[in-house]
Amino acid sequence: MLLLTNDDVERVLTMADCVDVLRRFFEEEGKGQVLTRQRTESWLPHLTTDTFYQCKTMEGGVPYIGKYVIRIDSNVTRKRQQGQSSRVEHVPFGNGSWMGTLLVFSTETGELLGWMPDGYLQRTRVGALYALAADYLARPDAEEVGLLGSGWQAGGQILGLRCVRTIKKVRVFSSNTDRCSRFAEELQASLGIEVRPVATARDAVANADIVALATNANEKVMESSWVEPGQHLSSVRFLELDPRAYEDCDRVVVNRVEPWIQNHYLGELCPQDIKDAKLPPAPPGAIEAREFFRQRIKRTGAREKTLFPNEASNYQLGGQFAAVAGFVLDRAREKGLGRDLPVEWFAQTLLP
């Protein structure tokens, strides 16, 4: 059984590789070669006000590489105010750590093949998935990005977009101005492109070719009316998107053929915004994510406003993790990375 660290994962998983892995994944999914159990979240009360325990799981099988993967995240989450906005954050334990695990099983023998944390892989998978969507929906000449958010996932969005478009300029806004400035400076230094912090969300959106929302906000971070003809809009979190965008955009990808996130909570104890969250009605002509990825449906004109919301990213989510984690495990073995542990430590001689 191969034990990997985030550093190991980073050494074998490039953003470009991940885009290719997901592109093939959706090809195989279209042939019926993927099985997914959708994301499930369980919520329990916590002693601290506005704080909850959350266990998040999802899983999937990809027989074309002989892997079945289960993702388990165990978190304590809390809400906090940041200026006029409400934010959600995961509370670290011990020495500043979080618990997120991917278990990789063989579909040929049933044994546990590998264990790895999900941190670097998750950021890369999200960036690659949204890049794949942008490859189909953004204008071919798109080169300027308006980015809302300055955290871990926000950086992943730019790294992904650079795999499918020649990005030359990024305008970034965050309600945390100090972090936004540091983020812009670091991203510009690492990528060698112009990354400029701006004073308002509207300044970031105006005249951008691609508008990427990647915040930890519990409410909308921009107005749908700001979206301009020809722009491609995406959102990593459900609550950060103005629901009117579903009506205002010309081409919208949705995921209504699969159950949405399954939330389980003890009694009435659950974050209110989780309990109240409902998907907006699918607009006429909306494209199901299943058909979007299988057929690689693209924009129809230069002035078309396109939208790839969070719900679309959840299509075959467990299977996405299986494909990427399976690729990482195979590549790590090829390169001699990780620590081999006796499989007997994780097996038993009793049949339950």
Name each region found by the language model.
Residues 1-123, 129-131, 141, 318, ...:
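N-terminal ligand-binding/catalytic initiation module
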Residues 6-10, 246-352:
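Adenosine-phosphate binding glycine-rich loop
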Residues 138-144, 166, 228-229:
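Short helix-loop-beta connector
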Residues 192-279:
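Rossmann-like adenosine-cofactor binding region
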Residues 154-155:
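N-terminal Rossmann-fold NAD(P) dinucleotide-binding loop
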Residues 164-188:
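NAD(P)-binding Rossmann-fold cofactor-contacting core
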Residues 118-122, 235-241, 312-318:
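Glycine-rich phosphate/pyrophosphate-binding beta-alpha loops
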